[in-house]
Amino acid sequence: DKDNSQESMISSNSLSFGKNRGEAYYSSNPTFYVGIDCIIFGFNEGEISLLLLKRNFEPAMGEWSLMGGFVQNNESVDDAAKRVLHELTGLENVYMEQVGTFGAIDRDPGERVISVAYYALININEYDRKLVQKHNAYWVNMNELPPLIFDHPEMVEKARELMKQKASVEPIGFNLLPKLF
């Protein structure tokens, strides 16, 4: 019986269950960080650009990175992505789509981090320039991207492909046009 085998598997782990059986189960498993990486596309002078930051913290200080942060205890991954985008650009109510989950064991040399990547399409004329400068971020033409840290090149490529597919069937590109249109 499938249920009995699961029950015996749990009890065979010799866990001591106190008042809260789930507490012991969860405490016997590893914990790790859940990160958010935002691939922020913008339209600039007829070209698609990507908002990157030059890291001023370890690991990989001084290298190019996507904008990112960590999921907090009180938020969903979608809410965390919106918060990260807002904290770094000042923008709200921006079209964002989940790109995927990136979880290679050694993807971040600092700690074990599983990252959920999102792409955003923004009007390059509407972000908070002072906030972006504060985070040491720069717009870089997609055809001139510098080497990126960790698995960020893979995230960018996957986001680019998703954006192309979506743009061929939906009018998502309107997010990049100035309000004049």
Residue ranges and their predicted role:
Residues 23-65:
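N-terminal strand-loop-strand
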Residues 36-38, 98, 118-120:
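A structural signal for short, well-ordered beta-strand segments
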Residues 92-100:
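A short coil-to-beta-strand element that immediately follows conserved catalytic motifs
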Residues 106-127, 159:
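Active-site-adjacent beta-strand/loop module that shapes the phosphate/pyrophosphate-binding cleft
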